[in-house]
């Protein structure tokens, strides 16, 4: 792991950009933390509006640090400047054609769109965790927040270092991931925008039902994809405060 830049922001946040092999990421920590800080992994959206420096992501990170946590994100395949697997480009084209024609989105399209991303992104997150948890100012427990929902589902199913998660229901989910969700037993707080045109609501409900967690909350709000009310974020903060502090 190598830190390649460092700056102190005006709200008491230390921002450090790092590389781990081919992985690029950013770590945000409280500038004056006296003890190791619990860590929250921030997932990203796929596509050109994602990336390490997207305004929404940076705002989430700074808000997370203001709540007393460390926050980190990595540039996963298909976000920002990092190219995704070629098969996902074709799947994205097939998805767009199906939606424009009013046809159902098949399981094959969803698998080709999501599974290749998981095969790269999940090992990248595990390598990032390996490196960050060696730092003296970072400690457990570890939470996951947001992004393409299938990524934290698989990560939580296979990596016991993830102890709680806030999930954003708003992306397509392969059937194999719904099955894998039965292995996820950590506390979960799931946000669902009820009127999100790009979200298969029933798929989101099926995924929530499949989770094996004894503590899981579905927080549904009226409105579209970008209409998440501020109080929903406040509820998510309280969730992490209960489970990570």
Q: How would you describe each model-predicted region?
A:
Residues 1-35:
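N-terminal cap/lid segment of alpha/beta-hydrolase-fold proteins
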Residues 40-134, 177:
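Serine-hydrolase catalytic machinery in alpha/beta-hydrolase-like enzymes
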Residues 119-183:
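Primarily recognizes the serine-hydrolase "nucleophile elbow" in alpha/beta-hydrolase
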Residues 175-176, 197-203:
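Conserved alpha/beta-hydrolase "acid-adjacent" motif
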Residues 184, 190-192:
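Short beta-strand/loop motif that positions the catalytic acidic residue
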Residues 194-199, 226-227:
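Acidic catalytic loop of the alpha/beta-hydrolase fold
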Residues 204-205, 209-227:
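Catalytic histidine neighborhood in serine/cysteine hydrolases
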Residues 222-223, 228-245:
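Catalytic active-site module of serine/aspartate enzymes centered on a nucleophile-bearing elbow/loop
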């Amino acid at each position: 792991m190598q830190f390649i830049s460092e700056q102190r922001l005006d709200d008491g946040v230390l921002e450090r950009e790092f590389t781990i092999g081919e992985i690029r990421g950013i770590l945000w920590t409280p500038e004056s933390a006296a003890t190791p800080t619990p860590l929250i992994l921030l997932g990203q959206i796929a596509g050109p509006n994602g990336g390490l420096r997207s305004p929404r992501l940076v705002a989430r990170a700074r808000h997370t640090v203001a709540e007393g946590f460390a926050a980190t994100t990595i540039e996963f395949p298909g976000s920002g400047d990092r190219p995704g697997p070629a098969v996902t480009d074709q799947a994205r084209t097939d998805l767009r054609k199906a939606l424009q024609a009013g046809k159902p989105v098949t399981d094959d399209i969803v698998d080709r769109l999501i599974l290749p991303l998981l095969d790269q992104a999940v090992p990248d997150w595990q390598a990032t965790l390996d490196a960050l948890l060696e730092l003296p100012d970072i400690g457990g427990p570890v939470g996951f927040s947001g992004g393409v929902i299938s990524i934290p589902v698989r990560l939580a199913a296979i990596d016991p270092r993830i102890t709680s998660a806030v999930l954003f229901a708003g992306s397509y989910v392969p059937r194999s991931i719904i099955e894998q969700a039965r292995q996820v037993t950590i506390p979960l707080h799931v946000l669902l925008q009820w009127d999100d045109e790009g979200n298969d609501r029933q798929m989101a409900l099926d995924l929530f039902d499949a989770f094996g967690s004894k503590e899981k909350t579905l927080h549904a709000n009226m409105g579209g994809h970008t209409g998440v009310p501020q109080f929903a974020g406040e509820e998510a903060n309280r969730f992490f405060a209960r489970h990570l502090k």
